[in-house]
Amino acid sequence: SRGLGDVYKRQITESLKRCNVLKINDEELITIGRLFGYPGLDIENKCWLILGKYNLDMLVLTCGVNGSYVFAPGVKSFQETPKVEVADTVGAGDSFTGTFCASILKGKSIQEAHELAVKVSAYVCTQNGAMPQIPEEYTL
């Protein structure tokens, strides 16, 4: 009989074969690394491996206070997480992902989209609640 890990691995593999952009966090990357047999690789090498193996257009990795990365063929962007006075982290990840995707769809470069996503996410962390009013300077 197959174990639960085999089921997860199969489901994740099928999903990766169908996607062109993958957004994951550092904890999910560790899990994927364990499932697919490369737990010893560092963050960047795991991301490059997944990007190439599944022919992804882009892999976005968020690492909380340790920054975030965007990998695309021939491109790596890293942004540090700004130091802010945190009021509430609810909505930070969604605001990052939404801002990044909207920026790319509006024609921004990976670097520009990444920078804005980090700024908006950091701003959201300084506000109470998941859906604060976003300042004009951060809108597209």
Q: What does each of the following model-derived ranges do?
A:
Residues 1-8:
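Short, small-residue-biased leader/transition segments that mark boundaries at the very start
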Residues 9-13:
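Short, glycine/polar-rich helix-capping loops at beta-to-alpha or helix-loop-helix junctions
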Residues 29-32, 68:
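A generic structural signal for short hydrophobic patches within well-formed alpha-helices
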Residues 19-26:
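A short beta-strand/loop micro-motif in the catalytic core of glycosyltransferases
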Residues 14-15, 52:
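Structural alpha-helical scaffold elements that stabilize or flank donor/cofactor-binding regions
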Residues 26-27, 63:
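Short secondary-structure boundary segments
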Residues 36, 40-140:
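Conserved phosphate-binding/catalytic region of the ribokinase-like
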